[in-house]
Amino acid sequence: MEKVVRRTNTPAGKKVSFSTAFPPDMPDLTADPVHVANVLSNLIENAIKYSGEEVNIDIVVLWNQQGVELTVSDNGFGIAPDERRKVFEKFYRSSHLPDKQIPGIGLGLSYVRQIVEAHHGSVSLRSELGEGTRITINLPTAAL
C-alpha cells in the first residue's frame, strides 16, 4: 500500500500532502494485490481530482483478526446527501461539482465497490459538501 502512495502523480497546479498510518506488524495481503492496489490508487486519484489546489489526504489502515480496514479521507469538495449512494453507480457524475471540467466518466467508485464486494468486503462513505469525503473499505480475513 505504501508503494501506491509513493507512485501517485501530482497533477500540475495541485499541492498534495499525505498522512499515512500503516500498522508495522500488518501481514501482507493475500487478496489480489493488483486489485487492492487499484482500489487504493482510485481512491487517492479521486481525492486529488475532487479537491481544490491544496489537497490533504489521510490514509489509515487498521488490522485485526476480522480483517483489514482501509480509510481514505480528503479535504475535497464533498458529496451532497442525495448523491452519496449514487456515486457508486456506473457512469454517475455529481451535479454539485464546482468545476464541471473535471475529467472522468463515473466509473471509479463503481469499480472500487465491485472489487471490494468480490473480496466479500464492504465500502462506506461519509461526506459533507465543502468538507471532504471519507471512504472506508473493509476486507474480511477470509478475503485476505
Model-derived features with residue positions:
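Conserved catalytic submotifs in the C-terminal HATPase_c
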Residues: 17-27
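Short helix-loop "hinge" at the ATP-lid/N-box region of the Bergerat-fold HATPase_c
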Residues: 47-48
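Short beta-strand/loop element within the Bergerat-fold HATPase_c
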Residues: 54-66
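Acidic ATP/Mg2+-coordinating residue in the GHKL
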Residues: 74
